């Protein structure tokens, strides 16, 4: 038997160990400190609320305040008030062709309305900044704030909005050329925006960055700045407690020791979940999603970097049957994992049954079965050295990107997510497919070279190159085009009216934002977190903001 085992050739990936060790196992929270900060925040919150709801304030000033609150990461405190104000302003049907409104103002209002799902059209309001040939006026290069605002607004575009496509090209080139000559904090803001677009960014990372910028503003409001800093630190304390909880759970499972071939990335999994929802009311949802991502990561590595095809045949059947009796048939090394997976879902079901939502686990399990079937197909392609046509590859790869499953599990702990939402996701609606496409093609671009080095030929890039007689560079360009079009679809699907709550729609949007952050610079930040994710994790979960 030992000799037989020795003869098994496994496609090991030799993943790097966790960067964090036991750093987050220890819980150093201080209830007294948290309570003191909470009380201060409540006082400041009332001050800010008064600013927001004050009568007689000009629309332009109120919209600028809403934009500042959102950028500082504190708008969730005033969700209801902001929705009401934006609805009232939207109903005014403001004539933005009035010369009283400059480019900065018009673009900011357009972006804020679109971010909240209001169908404001772009053709009517940006036309006056173009010449008779339809080109944007060169003189706009003297208006850095206006350019930046238009640049950020253009990322809210939908299909067919060529004026926003052109605006993005024009503002990108213009901002790159003028950035070195700007004064900070505007220069810093422009340089950051060119690397990380506001609409595609992780809200917590963007909040921390903007707090440091806002501190440099000459016209900053000191109460608002203090409120944002304290709120950031208080949320960080909550997130650290949750990270402590999932780190302890992960350590007690001891799957890292039992399955040393797999990536040990529970901290990065929590970072992912926190990007989907950071607000206090989603605490349970974050923990549940983190656990499902961590378990999926092990399944992925088992198919991709360890299991033989015979072992994977048995494991696929065991997941399909979803029964503890299946453990008898499984290879020894995967038994502890299978048991832990079934027990995790039993805990979920028990928890959700208390609120009459145990049905949610059924949808999650069915989605996991679909994911595992697709992993199995991919593993067989690898073993056989089969390179499928791009259409066949993509059909399977949209499932193996894991976002079908993780969009579903992101709603497990969201109390407002109802059966109709899970049913909607199970039918692969347009918004979900757009999300799957972004996840798939951006992942494929980032992992292509590493997978090629490991002998993996059934990659999206290879398949597209062969089908279209394309070079690697042409394939990558096409994949970015696919992602950009998918973002347009997501923007469209976030518009009102929608049969689904923004609570649900924002989960899909935020899952895509995490892709943009994690694979920034065409790097696989999840597998190799040192360069891309480590600085973010330190800023979000280790270092508080100095008050």
UniProtKB/Swiss-Prot annotation:
Binding residue positions for Mg(2+) 3: 443, 451
Binding positions for Mg(2+) 1 per the UniProt entry: 300, 304
BP terms from Gene Ontology: diterpenoid biosynthetic process; green leaf volatile biosynthetic process; sesquiterpene biosynthetic process
Cofactor comment: Binds 3 Mg(2+) or Mn(2+) ions per subunit.
Gene3D superfamilies: Farnesyl Diphosphate Synthase, Terpene synthase, N-terminal domain
Catalytic activity: (2E,6E)-farnesyl diphosphate = germacrene A + diphosphate; (2E,6E)-farnesyl diphosphate = (1S,2S,4R)-beta-elemene + diphosphate
GO cellular component terms, semicolon-separated: chloroplast
Tissue: Expressed in leaves.
Pfam family, one: Terpene_synth_C
Pathways per UniProt: Secondary metabolite biosynthesis; terpenoid biosynthesis
Segments carrying motif DDXXD motif: 300-304
Record InterPro entries: Isoprenoid_synthase_dom_sf, Terpene_cyclase-like_1_C, Terpene_cyclase_plant_C1, Terpene_synth_N, Terpene_synth_N_sf, Terpene_synthase-like, Terpene_synthase_metal-bd, Terpenoid_cyclase/PrenylTrfase
Known EC number: 4.2.3.-
Enzyme class name: lyase
Keyword terms, alphabetized: Chloroplast, Lyase, Magnesium, Metal-binding, Plastid
Binding residues for Mg(2+) 2: 300, 304
UniProt note: domains: The Asp-Asp-Xaa-Xaa-Asp/Glu (DDXXD/E) motif is important for the catalytic activity, presumably through binding to Mg(2+).
Protein name in UniProt: Germacrene A synthase
The species this protein was found in: Lavandula pedunculata subsp. lusitanica
